[in-house]
Amino acid sequence: LGDIMSDAYVYAVENAADFDGVPVDVAVVPSGTVRDTYAKGDITVEQVFNSFSLGIGADGVPGYPLISVYLTGKELKTAAEIDASVSDFMTTARLYCSGLDFTYNPNRMILNKVTDVYLDDGTQRIELEDDKLYRVVADLYSGQMLSAVTDMSYGLLSLVPKYADGTPIEDFEDVIITENGKEL
Protein backbone atom coordinates (compact mmCIF):
# COMPACT_ATOMS: atom_id res chain seq x y z
CA LEU A 1 0.00 0.00 0.00
CA GLY A 2 2.89 2.37 0.76
CA ASP A 3 4.20 1.99 -2.79
CA ILE A 4 0.79 2.95 -4.19
CA MET A 5 0.66 5.94 -1.86
CA SER A 6 4.12 7.15 -2.89
CA ASP A 7 3.09 6.87 -6.56
CA ALA A 8 -0.07 8.81 -5.67
CA TYR A 9 2.08 11.59 -4.16
CA VAL A 10 3.91 11.99 -7.46
CA TYR A 11 0.65 11.96 -9.41
CA ALA A 12 -1.00 14.49 -7.07
CA VAL A 13 1.90 16.93 -7.24
CA GLU A 14 2.54 16.67 -10.97
CA ASN A 15 -1.16 16.94 -11.82
CA ALA A 16 -2.03 19.76 -9.42
CA ALA A 17 -3.35 22.97 -10.93
CA ASP A 18 -0.41 24.85 -9.35
CA PHE A 19 2.29 22.37 -10.55
CA ASP A 20 5.54 24.30 -10.88
CA GLY A 21 6.84 22.14 -13.73
CA VAL A 22 9.67 20.60 -11.70
CA PRO A 23 9.24 16.82 -11.82
CA VAL A 24 9.27 14.83 -8.60
CA ASP A 25 12.35 12.61 -8.48
CA VAL A 26 11.38 10.65 -5.36
CA ALA A 27 8.28 10.37 -3.18
CA VAL A 28 8.54 8.73 0.24
CA VAL A 29 5.92 7.17 2.53
CA PRO A 30 7.17 5.68 5.82
CA SER A 31 5.17 2.65 6.88
CA GLY A 32 4.47 4.25 10.25
CA THR A 33 2.16 6.75 8.57
CA VAL A 34 0.02 4.07 6.89
CA ARG A 35 -2.87 3.38 9.27
CA ASP A 36 -4.90 0.66 7.56
CA THR A 37 -4.86 -1.69 4.62
CA TYR A 38 -7.44 -2.81 2.07
CA ALA A 39 -9.14 -6.13 1.52
CA LYS A 40 -9.64 -7.41 -2.01
CA GLY A 41 -12.69 -5.86 -3.65
CA ASP A 42 -14.22 -2.43 -3.88
CA ILE A 43 -12.51 0.30 -1.87
CA THR A 44 -14.57 3.07 -0.30
CA VAL A 45 -13.60 6.68 0.33
CA GLU A 46 -13.90 5.92 4.05
CA GLN A 47 -11.33 3.11 3.77
CA VAL A 48 -8.91 5.37 1.92
CA PHE A 49 -9.39 8.10 4.53
CA ASN A 50 -8.86 5.66 7.41
CA SER A 51 -5.66 4.34 5.87
CA PHE A 52 -4.02 7.71 5.61
CA SER A 53 -5.69 10.28 7.85
CA LEU A 54 -2.84 10.76 10.31
CA GLY A 55 -2.36 14.33 11.53
CA ILE A 56 -3.80 17.64 10.50
CA GLY A 57 -2.46 20.48 8.41
CA ALA A 58 -2.30 24.18 9.26
CA ASP A 59 -5.53 24.52 7.28
CA GLY A 60 -7.37 22.29 9.79
CA VAL A 61 -8.09 19.54 7.24
CA PRO A 62 -7.36 15.98 8.48
CA GLY A 63 -4.25 14.36 7.04
CA TYR A 64 -0.77 15.81 6.84
CA PRO A 65 -0.18 17.96 3.75
CA LEU A 66 2.53 17.15 1.23
CA ILE A 67 5.84 18.98 1.26
CA SER A 68 8.49 19.41 -1.41
CA VAL A 69 12.15 19.36 -0.38
CA TYR A 70 15.50 18.64 -1.98
CA LEU A 71 18.07 16.06 -0.89
CA THR A 72 21.46 15.35 -2.39
CA GLY A 73 22.22 12.07 -4.11
CA LYS A 74 24.42 11.19 -1.15
CA GLU A 75 21.50 11.81 1.23
CA LEU A 76 19.20 9.63 -0.89
CA LYS A 77 21.81 6.87 -0.63
CA THR A 78 21.81 7.38 3.14
CA ALA A 79 18.00 7.09 3.20
CA ALA A 80 18.25 3.78 1.32
CA GLU A 81 20.88 2.56 3.77
CA ILE A 82 18.71 3.51 6.75
CA ASP A 83 15.78 1.65 5.21
CA ALA A 84 17.87 -1.46 4.50
CA SER A 85 19.58 -1.45 7.90
CA VAL A 86 16.94 -0.27 10.35
CA SER A 87 13.47 -1.15 9.05
CA ASP A 88 13.62 -4.83 10.05
CA PHE A 89 14.12 -3.72 13.67
CA MET A 90 11.88 -0.66 13.53
CA THR A 91 9.11 -1.51 11.08
CA THR A 92 7.51 1.94 11.26
CA ALA A 93 10.70 3.27 9.64
CA ARG A 94 10.32 1.14 6.48
CA LEU A 95 10.28 3.49 3.49
CA TYR A 96 8.04 3.03 0.48
CA CYS A 97 9.50 5.03 -2.37
CA SER A 98 8.42 6.05 -5.82
CA GLY A 99 11.35 6.80 -8.09
CA LEU A 100 14.13 5.43 -5.87
CA ASP A 101 15.28 1.83 -6.19
CA PHE A 102 18.03 0.02 -4.37
CA THR A 103 19.50 -3.42 -3.88
CA TYR A 104 20.94 -4.59 -0.60
CA ASN A 105 22.61 -7.60 0.96
CA PRO A 106 20.93 -8.43 4.31
CA ASN A 107 24.04 -10.33 5.44
CA ARG A 108 26.31 -7.28 5.39
CA MET A 109 27.06 -5.04 8.38
CA ILE A 110 24.43 -2.55 9.51
CA LEU A 111 24.69 0.75 7.62
CA ASN A 112 26.67 -1.02 4.91
CA LYS A 113 23.98 -3.21 3.35
CA VAL A 114 23.09 -1.26 0.19
CA THR A 115 24.98 -2.46 -2.86
CA ASP A 116 23.24 -0.36 -5.53
CA VAL A 117 20.94 2.69 -5.46
CA TYR A 118 19.54 4.68 -8.35
CA LEU A 119 16.55 6.64 -9.63
CA ASP A 120 13.99 4.99 -11.88
CA ASP A 121 11.69 7.33 -13.78
CA GLY A 122 9.67 4.45 -15.21
CA THR A 123 11.62 4.34 -18.46
CA GLN A 124 15.27 4.26 -17.44
CA ARG A 125 17.79 3.83 -14.67
CA ILE A 126 19.37 7.12 -13.60
CA GLU A 127 22.57 7.06 -11.57
CA LEU A 128 22.59 9.33 -8.52
CA GLU A 129 25.14 12.12 -8.38
CA ASP A 130 26.30 12.65 -4.79
CA ASP A 131 26.24 16.47 -4.88
CA LYS A 132 23.19 16.96 -7.11
CA LEU A 133 19.90 18.03 -5.53
CA TYR A 134 16.83 15.87 -6.20
CA ARG A 135 13.22 16.85 -5.58
CA VAL A 136 11.59 14.72 -2.89
CA VAL A 137 7.93 14.77 -1.87
CA ALA A 138 6.71 13.44 1.47
CA ASP A 139 4.10 14.34 4.05
CA LEU A 140 4.72 17.09 6.60
CA TYR A 141 5.13 14.66 9.50
CA SER A 142 7.83 12.70 7.69
CA GLY A 143 9.74 15.88 6.92
CA GLN A 144 9.58 17.00 10.52
CA MET A 145 10.90 13.61 11.67
CA LEU A 146 14.06 13.75 9.53
CA SER A 147 16.04 15.36 12.34
CA ALA A 148 15.56 12.09 14.25
CA VAL A 149 18.01 10.46 11.82
CA THR A 150 20.85 12.66 13.03
CA ASP A 151 19.80 12.34 16.67
CA MET A 152 19.34 8.55 16.65
CA SER A 153 22.65 7.99 14.83
CA TYR A 154 24.49 10.35 17.20
CA GLY A 155 25.47 12.49 14.24
CA LEU A 156 26.86 9.67 12.11
CA LEU A 157 24.08 10.04 9.53
CA SER A 158 22.44 13.19 8.32
CA LEU A 159 19.57 14.08 6.03
CA VAL A 160 19.15 17.85 5.68
CA PRO A 161 16.11 18.85 3.59
CA LYS A 162 16.79 21.89 1.46
CA TYR A 163 15.16 24.39 -0.86
CA ALA A 164 15.94 24.06 -4.58
CA ASP A 165 18.87 26.47 -4.12
CA GLY A 166 20.46 24.24 -1.47
CA THR A 167 19.55 26.36 1.55
CA PRO A 168 18.53 24.18 4.54
CA ILE A 169 14.84 24.31 5.44
CA GLU A 170 14.11 25.68 8.92
CA ASP A 171 10.30 25.47 8.91
CA PHE A 172 8.63 22.67 6.95
CA GLU A 173 5.36 24.57 6.81
CA ASP A 174 7.13 26.90 4.35
CA VAL A 175 7.42 24.04 1.82
CA ILE A 176 3.85 22.73 1.96
CA ILE A 177 2.53 22.09 -1.54
CA THR A 178 -0.71 23.89 -2.35
CA GLU A 179 -3.31 23.74 -5.06
CA ASN A 180 -5.61 26.71 -5.55
CA GLY A 181 -4.53 28.04 -2.16
CA LYS A 182 -5.30 24.80 -0.29
CA GLU A 183 -2.82 22.32 1.15
CA LEU A 184 -2.32 19.27 -1.03
Which stretches of residues belong to each language-model region?
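Solvent-exposed loop/linker segments at secondary-structure transitions
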Residues: 1-161
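Long, compositionally biased interface segments
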Residues: 160-184
